[in-house]
Amino acid sequence: MQVKIVQVFPCLVLLVKLVLLSVLLPSATGSYHCSNNATQNSYLWRIEASPPIYLFGTMHVPYKKLWDDVPDNVKSVLSLSEHLCVELRLTDSETSKNLSACRYLPKNETLESVLPGGLYVRVLKYFVRIQNQFPKWLFGNASINGLSRIESDRLFHAMIGNWNRLRPVWLLMLISSLSRENVQERSIPLLDVFLDRAAEGMGKNVEAVEVYKEQCRPFNRLNNTKVFVALRKLLDYLEPLADGPISSTDSDLETYNCGDFKSLVSARPILPLPSSSKLPNLTSEEAGDLESINEFLVSQIVYRRNRRMSKTIMSLLSRQRNETYLFAIGAGHFVGERNVVHMLKKKGYSVNRLSVTETIPGPPLPKNIISLGDPSSQLTILNISSTIPTLPPNRPSHVPPTLSPETIARIIQSVFNNTQSIYTVDSVEVTPTTTSLNSATASTTVATPTSSVTPPTSSSSQTRSLTISDSQRTSDDSAFIPSASSGLRYNIGLVCVTLFFVLLIITSAL
């Protein structure tokens, strides 16, 4: 009997490692603490009115990266406010559907027919190389077997979705979002979505400041020829890194938490491209094309939206009200030229930026604030899919993003891999549509899944918006919405099967 136990012991160790790896592997989160907290500024402003209106500058990143470092006075304002106003209600099915549809080419058009041939081949090759990295990004140093490869491929295809139908600018943003960190953090809600859900769970009224067109359409107006230049330069930068652990930087998170976000935002281009000094072989003509793109987007995505947001806030200030409002919008709208705070002050309003040390009396946040903002956090122990992604036939986990200037690349990441969606998948066909390159160009194959997604009929009232002339805005046709979700039944089943085999081996040994 001792011999049998010795023989089965390595199997037991292997199975226990599998369970521990699948349920205990932590997700990548960040927490940054500044050395001089006494003088640290929060991204919280107060408009002196009765009652006051508060403005909070967010970052569109997974909430776990920031929530612990959000100052107490911001959390107090969230607790005492009766209303939370966000850029867009990403939890609203119509908003999500329209944002997704906005990203796609007109009917009967594909990237294969739009992109220059050589550029299309480069995109195909790059996707194949990134697909080969997914098992390493998901499982780390764990051995890569057939099951992990299959699951990695399923997640990859779910994240790139119907990529051949994307407009070129959205293809560029998809490519920039495919990094190890984004894959590992795909199921963590963005801070904006977390605040939205938490406020709604606390019984507060959550309203939208904008509609999807104001955020999406400026990108679709870009000249495709110049977008092709940006896409080529992005691939020039990423291709040498494609066989390694491509990661996004957290330096802006540290800068944000330490109260000096202004310099970073003012110098960063809107498109998710590295700085010009990092782009190889950049000609003066290419640099001019990239600069003209950035100038156009700054005027449309930053300045025009700043004007609209400030008008919305001023309209609210002119009303007779007795309730407190908190506006949680991207921090980039509060810094730089012609920002929201500057426009409010120009109209005579008193707006003060608050220090983290300034106390704001208010009731404490509920103890279950995390589960209100992130319902999936209650399943952490059994969240095997944090390392083994699945695509069950219900409950997809992605919604399209909001587009704010200071973190535009991260916002686009949420379209493909971050927040949980409220869509219901009636049917999912993972029938690969294979695009093969002939031997004259490359021996590369990329499979793209197709999916049928239907938004549910909501029992709640229609999402309220603070914007003006909503009746003049129409919805675009819906389009394919890629999704990849984690299923609780799958998680429990895998753990049960593993434990069953452990007991079976022990029993046979005895």
From Swiss-Prot:
Subcellular location: Membrane
Secretion signal span: 1-30
Low complexity bias locations: 435-471
CDD domains named in the record: Tiki
Keyword Signal in annotation: yes
Protein's job: Metalloprotease.
Bilayer topology: Single-pass type I membrane protein
Cofactors (names): Mn(2+); Co(2+)
Intervals, Extracellular compartment: 31-489
Membrane-spanning segments: 490-510
Gene Ontology CC entries for this record: membrane
Region (Disordered): 435-477
Main subcellular location of this protein, as a coarse class: membrane
Entry keywords, A to Z: Glycoprotein, Hydrolase, Membrane, Metal-binding, Metalloprotease, Protease, Signal, Transmembrane, Transmembrane helix
BP term (GO), one: negative regulation of Wnt signaling pathway
Glycosylated residues (UniProt): 37, 98, 108, 141, 223, 281, 322, 383, 417
Protein name: Metalloprotease TIKI homolog
Annotated EC: 3.4.-.-
Cofactor note: Divalent metal cations. Mn(2+) or Co(2+).
InterPro entries assigned to the protein according to its UniProt record, in alphabetical order: TIKI1/2-like, TraB/PrgY/GumN_fam
Enzyme class, first EC level, given as a word: hydrolase
Entry's family note: Belongs to the TIKI family.
Pfam families from the UniProt entry: TraB_PrgY_gumN
Any one Gene Ontology molecular-function term assigned to this protein's record: metalloendopeptidase activity
